[in-house]
Amino acid sequence: MPKIALRNPLDGFKKAVDQASARLQAEVFHGPIGRAVSETPKTGWVAKGIARLGLTAFKPAPPPPVLKRPVVMITGLTMEAASYDPMAKHLASNSANGKVAVYVVADGKFHDGGVNGKVLTDAQAAKTRMFQIQYTDVKGAPSDKEPQLERAFRAIQRATHAPALDVVAHSAGCTDFRLYLDRRPAADRSIGINEAVFIGPASHGTFMGNVGNAVGRPIGVEKAGTELEIGSPLVQHLNDGWAGQRNQVKGDVTILGISGAPTPGKGGVSNGDGFMPVNQLDMAHAHTIVLKGSDPTPVAHLMQVGYSGVIAEVQKRLAQ
């Protein structure tokens, strides 16, 4: 008798979740909501209202500087490379910075402007100073993504021949990057890191990781949740070894947080971005800046990479 392939009843659910996530990210970063809160200049009564309310997360982003070094943009859990498009678009408005190139780990190539853009040679990729990374699986755990970062950093250094790179990482992407610093081979330590900016990092784990560990299997984030949850062995290992990671960053490590949403964490619920409490971001020898937001939901954590106030703070660091 021929074998009958049985479908996993969860496959349809996972597909629906993935499609919903893609639609949400498209709206967040490219729809009217994303445009309203990102790099769009805030003028007139809008600027006055933002200033009066002290909503520093939405302060205007000044014209971008010329970037000092190539910038590597590392995404958070479930986030596509395009989540950095608002920031990249703003920085690219200074023509000296070039257009963004996306390193797609799955094919090991640079693509022009997006994951489906034309393939670039190393010489063509070297004309930009902005590099997004598209993981093979955006729901992967830090231990799965770290080897992919090794390949990406090698490729970017090979193309640019830059003595040092700057890094902007978001959410779990900060954990991915820290694990890269922790594990990268001695030969890769010649790839210098100058400035590092962490946006909404899970510095000491995140309660959302605990949730993912408990109920994340149907949507494929159980392993990531296990590694990112508060008190996980990976988080403890990285925090115990933070000094070694910090020493590999020649310049400053800047942590950006957003307030305005009730956020669960160690010790209960406090102020944060819905995922990360602002009182649990700090790390030794890093400078923490908290910007005031207005979204009382966890959507703030997803959207913050496109907030004009965040872009303003990031570009300050990239001009150092």
Q: Language-model segments: what does each one mean?
A:
Residues 1-15:
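Short, compositionally biased, intrinsically disordered N-terminal export/targeting signals
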Residues 12, 24-320:
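Lipid deacylating catalytic domains
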